[in-house]
Structures are given as C-alpha cells and as structure tokens.
Amino acid sequence: VASGGPKRRIQLTGFRGREKKALVELLFKLDCVFLDSKKYKNCTHLIAKKLCKSEKFLAACAAGKWILTKEYIINSAESGRWLDETTYEWGYKIEKDTHYSPQTQSAPKRWRKELMQSSAPGAFHRWKVILAVKEGGKRMMSVIRVLQAGKATICSSQNMGSDITHIFLHNKFFLLQNEKHFPEDQCYPLQYIEDYLLE
C-alpha cells in the first residue's frame, strides 16, 4: 500500500457543487482526513481543479505540499487505496496550449522537490517580513496564511530591525506617506509573493 505513515490531510481548491460533492464522497471511501475550508489548513495534499492563484494553491506551493489533479482521488478510490502521487502532480506534464508558462505549470513540483532536497521548512523561510498594508482585510489575512505556510517571519513595523528582508506594500501611496521608514530596495508589491512562487 502506498499509504504508509500518517493519514493524508486533504484539501480541495476550485471545485464547486456536484463535482465537489462527488469528490468528497470518494474521499470518505479512502483513509484520510478531509479539511473542508476556504482557508489553507496545513494539508498534506491539495487537490486542485486547475492551476490557479488561490490562497490554498499558493500556500501549498510555499509549504512544498503535493498539489494534485482530481484523477488522483478518482483513481485511488477505484483502486481502493491511495496510489503513488507522482503522475498526478500538477507540473508532471507541461501543457503546450495554455496561457500558463511552463515555469508556472511546474511550480508545485518544483517547490516540493526543492524543499524536500534542501530540507528547508518553507519557500520563505529566510524572509523577515513587514506588511505595510491596511490591517485586517480578508485579502490581508489570506496573504499572511500564505507567508506563514512558507515559514516567513512576520514582524511588526514598530520594530523595524536591520535584518528585515521584505516590506510589502499595498500601493505606492503608502510608501510616500511613510517614506522615511522604509528603504526602497526592500519594498515590494504584494504581487511579488505570487510571482516568487509561480514564475
């Protein structure tokens, strides 16, 4: 059986309605914990309907988790046991006729292998981050979960140490208001997080 070790913790992203319901029914036939949440919940395997930039997709990439196609669930359920993940991983085959670059398509596989080989705890483990953005919005909480999944250290802008590596800004206007505090070469738009993972 391919399913040695601890139970798989499965999340889904991009599935709705009937399709999601059918996959969840199959999951109940398999030995796993299904985490039904819109937020990333430290799953071991993310099943994605398509390549996307959802919080769960980015967080799973940053944490080096398996990101797989739905066939992984369907075929495993048919076999009555978990199959080997390799051929079901997003990035296993690079598609030609898609608007996603080969680099983006291979991102899940690339990060999983890189983090496994380097034993790094996450894609952002060397980052010390300040979020110079409006507090508490939904998007903000989502960005924080992605950064935490990749093991970034998030610092408050009050204690601006010299070892800060990245300052993320909502927009340039914020920078103008706070120009004295932030060294320009450490300032990045939020978009950079996505690009760093997928490009």
Each language-model region and where it sits:
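BRCT (BRCA1 C-terminal) phosphopeptide-binding modules in DNA damage response/checkpoint, repair
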Residues: 2-4, 38, 51-128, 132, ...
